[in-house]
Amino acid sequence: MSINLQNVSYTYQAGTPFEGRALFNINLDILDGSYTAFIGHTGSGKSTIMQLLNGLHVPTTGIVSVDKQDITNHSKNKEIKSIRKHVGLVFQFPESQLFEETVLKDVAFGPQNFGVSPEEAEALAREKLALVGISENLFEKNPFELSGGQMRRVAIAGILAMQPKVLVLDEPTAGLDPKGRKELMTIFKKLHQSGMTIVLVTHLMDDVANYADFVYVLDKGKIILSGKPKTIFQQVSLLEKKQLGVPKVTKLAQRLVDRGIPISSLPITLEELREVLKHG
């Protein structure tokens, strides 16, 4: 499922003394089956774009096209409902949205809300809970009895149970320890390998380098760079000026260049660095 934004602008609280422009004439494509990352400083417009992708917001001007279905300023909620089923949005700290009395019921709620039978919803819930690493002995537990990492997995399973074609992740590993972050990113990688389109908002440049195949860089509501991670992370000075930084490996390689060691193309992953050091 592909997504296209055409001349999209968004203004919060439009027509009031408190209005603020969040996005300015955004044009972008998210290709079917891609793993697209959005990076930018706080207030750059990343989260606003995420909420436009599944119709949580509608554009003030312009068109958001999801699988050839258009969302405009005039779109009604009932017209957007099918888009929300196909574009799953995982907020920061999604565990805050848990509410049912058991893990299984919480994950099954979403599919039932979209008209799936209780039996099929439970089957989907079991399947997705297993996929995110929640063991069956936890299914009848109250979600709030689980650890923070387990609660987040349950919340993500709830989104996956609605069988989205696109998964939008807004800082999905925020607050997790390195082990939990790695495990969660591995789950998303496997989903992408299975054919799902992944959209990631993150401030962790190593994750962008290791997982994404395309990157948009936002600043003050505008796209200032776009391209493959390898190309984007060659712009070390610009990214550091925007307080975004680069992958750790890239930063190390840049220091070597600054000391006179010739490196024609800065590596962005550990594997690439090994190749550079091996072959000179």
Swiss-Prot record:
EC number(s) given by UniProt: 7.-.-.-
Any one GO molecular-function label of the UniProt entry: ATP hydrolysis activity
Family annotation (Gene3D superfamilies): P-loop containing nucleotide triphosphate hydrolases (3.40.50.300)
Keyword Translocase among UniProt keywords: yes
Protein localization: Cell membrane
Keywords (A to Z) from UniProt: ATP-binding, Cell membrane, Membrane, Nucleotide-binding, Translocase, Transport
Gene Ontology cellular component annotations, sorted alphabetically: ATP-binding cassette (ABC) transporter complex
Membrane topology: Peripheral membrane protein
Summary of the function given for this chain in its UniProt record: ATP-binding (A) component of a common energy-coupling factor (ECF) ABC-transporter complex. Unlike classic ABC transporters this ECF transporter provides the energy necessary to transport a number of different substrates.
Subunit structure: Forms a stable energy-coupling factor (ECF) transporter complex composed of 2 membrane-embedded substrate-binding proteins (S component), 2 ATP-binding proteins (A component) and 2 transmembrane proteins (T component).
Entry protein name: Energy-coupling factor transporter ATP-binding protein EcfA2
